[in-house]
Amino acid sequence: MQKLAVFLFAIAAVCIHCEAKYYSTRCDLVRELRKQGFPENQMGDWVCLVENESGRKTDKVGPVNKNGSKDYGLFQINDKYWCSNTRTPGKDCNVTCADLLLDDITKASTCAKKIFKRHNFRAWYGWRNHCDGKTLPDTSNC
């Protein structure tokens, strides 16, 4: 019985990442962001943000922040205000934090755009520290 429990735990641990995606190239990410309706004139900022926040991984969960919150997904969206850590969608983006970890980034994109509309890119420390006022990634060849 104990071996079965260990086996099932191992399968569950692997499957947590079954629906995750890693954008292996910058252009893969750019194509997906275009599909999600991100504006072309902001593409360099969004790519820089994603690369510095999550490393282009949809399943990234950040470490616990000083206030006890965590950041989730491709855009590292915070659970204090934006996503619910329960099975019921909630908070300002009306999503679960698990929704933000899927390879389908539709909900994460919608939430990121909502955050941007309220706070601009300054809502993300990865953007502030690595992108603001710096040379942005060139996405023109994608």
UniProtKB/Swiss-Prot annotation:
Disulfide partners: 27-142, 48-131, 83-97, 93-111
The C-type lysozyme domain, residue ranges: 21-142
List of catalytic residues: 53, 71
Superkingdom classification of source: Eukaryota
Entry annotated with the keyword Mitochondrion: no
GO molecular function annotations of the record: lysozyme activity
SUPFAM superfamilies per UniProt: Lysozyme-like
Pfam families documented for this protein: Lys
GO BP field: defense response to bacterium; killing of cells of another organism
Coiled coil feature spans: none
Catalytic activity from the UniProt record: Hydrolysis of (1->4)-beta-linkages between N-acetylmuramic acid and N-acetyl-D-glucosamine residues in a peptidoglycan and between N-acetyl-D-glucosamine residues in chitodextrins
Stored InterPro entries: Glyco_hydro_22, Glyco_hydro_22_CS, Glyco_hydro_22_lys, Lysozyme-like_dom_sf
Signal peptide boundaries: 1-20
EC code(s) of this entry: 3.2.1.17
Keyword set, alphabetical order: Antimicrobial, Bacteriolytic enzyme, Disulfide bond, Glycosidase, Hydrolase, Signal
Matching PANTHER family: LYSOZYME C
UniProt family annotation: Belongs to the glycosyl hydrolase 22 family.
Role played: Lysozymes have primarily a bacteriolytic function; those in tissues and body fluids are associated with the monocyte-macrophage system and enhance the activity of immunoagents.
Protein name in UniProt: Lysozyme
Origin species: Hyphantria cunea
